[in-house]
Amino acid sequence: MRKWRIEDSSELYNVPGWGLKYFSINEKGHMQVTPCDGCAAVDLKEVMDELRLRDVTSPILLRFPDILDNRIEKISKCFKKAAQEYEYKGQNFVVYPIKVNQMRQVVEEIVSHGNKYNIGLEAGSKPELHAVLATNAHEKSLIICNGYKDEDYIELALLAQKMGRRVILVVEKLNELKLIAEVSKRLKIEPNIGIRIKLSSSGSGKWEESGGDVSKFGLNSSELLDALAFLERNKLTNCLQLIHFHIGSQITKIRRIKNALREAMQFYVQLSKIGFKIDFVDIGGGLGVDYDGTRSSSGENSMNYSIQEYVNDSVSALVDVCVKNNLPQPNIITESGRSLTAHHSVLIIDVLETTQLPIWSENMEIGENDHELAVELYNIWDKINSSRVFEDWHDALQIREEALELFSLGLLDLKTRAQIEKLFWSVARDVNELTRSMKHPPEELRKVARMLPEKYFCNFSLFQSLPDSWAIDQMFPIMPIARLDEKPNRLATLQDITCDSDGKISKFVSPQGASYGLPVHSLKNGEPYYIGVFLVGAYQEILGDMHNLFGDTNAVHISVDKDGFEIAQVIDGETVADVLDYVEYSPKKLVRNVEAWVTNSMKKGIITAEEGRQFLNNYRSGLYGYTYLERD
């Protein structure tokens, strides 16, 4: 058999499918990141080695701002190409909805690099609006105000408009329009108004219900007519500048996007014909990310189109309807936050330890005095073959069930239970091997593979760093970042360090779309084994929660040019004191309480003065240390 090659690892983890040109494996067998054309490739193992020397420990979120820049350029170039092809006469405005990732460094990078592309920002709440207004965006860039609004929200937006910012208040509910009219009249400011329209068309994938007739936001046709009548009565007709729709995030099928565009553009036609001058059509988000690399619409973690196809369909739909109806071509706004940010962040976690299922080794024997159930199961394992694998598996399941019942009744000793466990899992392994050789294995036998992966315990919290994996079964590309020139010899699920059985990942990207175990290597003594979780730049940081009080991880910004990489910034993860403060514990008071307890224990002679001093030192240092496990 030939030696394992890096090309084999690349295929095994489907890196070309999901990695685009950003992620690949180098000749050392290490994962590398190439943020842009002309940039040097960054060896992730070398990055981790350097961070380790700086005492920056995993879990670590690596951010590559140059990838953000590249995504902005890519989307903008796609629109430029489509405009030329379809003779589009309007402008395209890329607007970043900061809810996707509100981290200041991310927003500022998008605004800074996006200034030459007139990148705008979208706020969906009052706190987000405060952040957006204080961000130094280009004066020509748009600020789109979505979400529910109160009087303070509207007043803030209108006064920002008066001071020169291009702010558009998008009406989500009919009563917001009345409130906008009241506040604008009081402030004597003519508002820039948009209306979100509830389309019948819906998206596809996990967020399909975000669009369609039952969607949370938007005005239906009847409400839209009421809104238009209200604008006319209050002499605000000229204020309506934008119509907006959104049919859901991560749309998997391009056909759904086309249907929505066709429906939305008819609203533009109807409003134009009755005298409203609409300058902007905001087509919302939905541009997908190919998390599993299959370029398929059959699952929820991919999509069957490219950015260019998405843009072409958007531009051509708008141009076609305007030409047919002899109408001016409005500007297009896109809010593709997931596509902008997903690729720029990589989570690196290290494996702490492993456990595997017990097996019966070949040098073990069954004796005359062993329990009859153990003898029977041993004979099944000893003689199992493809001709009777179904029957053998059913018999093994029955014997195991009988043994567990007898043990619960006190009729089976611990030694026999252990024998049954080892033999059962040995049978399961053999059944799985025989099943893999079948051309059309039955579903029952295919499920055996899901029972067998080892457990790799990793230093992270699924709920903090990958909440979508837990909440909605989102798949992310996951793989070791080194030893990729070696053939993996283990299949594992990943377990986090929370005290929660849901804190695990048991579904992984593969060339076929999904696998119930991750191919990994055996651990080597004294050598860290790092696993990378890719495409985590959208939503994960901001949705993460503090289950078991595990806080934000360390974050590292890496700048790249043609000559190499630089660790531009290290942002320390949250300390124990930080997370305790969130739940109303005062670190200073905690220390005082512990000091009093230790002093009292020393007075009573329970501990020595040296033991008390050591305990207090450990307590204080731990209080201001990382919430995750730290190893020398």
Label every model-predicted segment.
Residues 305, 313-315, 319-632:
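Charged (often Lys/Glu-rich) extended helix/loop segments that serve as interaction or gating elements
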Residues 87-282, 287-293, 299, 304-309, ...:
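Active-site-proximal beta-alpha core segment in soluble small-molecule metabolic enzymes
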Residues 25-102:
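Low-complexity, highly charged intrinsically disordered N-terminal segments
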Residues 58, 62, 84-89, 274-278, ...:
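Flexible, glycine/charged-enriched surface loops at secondary-structure junctions
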Residues 30, 38, 67, 101-103, ...:
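Short, glycine-/Ser/Thr-/acidic-enriched flexible segments
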Residues 66-74, 226, 263, 313:
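A non-catalytic, amphipathic alpha-helix used as a structural packing/dimerization or gating element
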Residues 1-57, 559, 566, 576-580:
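Conserved, well-structured core domains of diverse proteins
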Residues 8, 73-81, 104-109, 129-130, ...:
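Short alpha-helical segments and helix-capping/turn motifs at coil-helix boundaries
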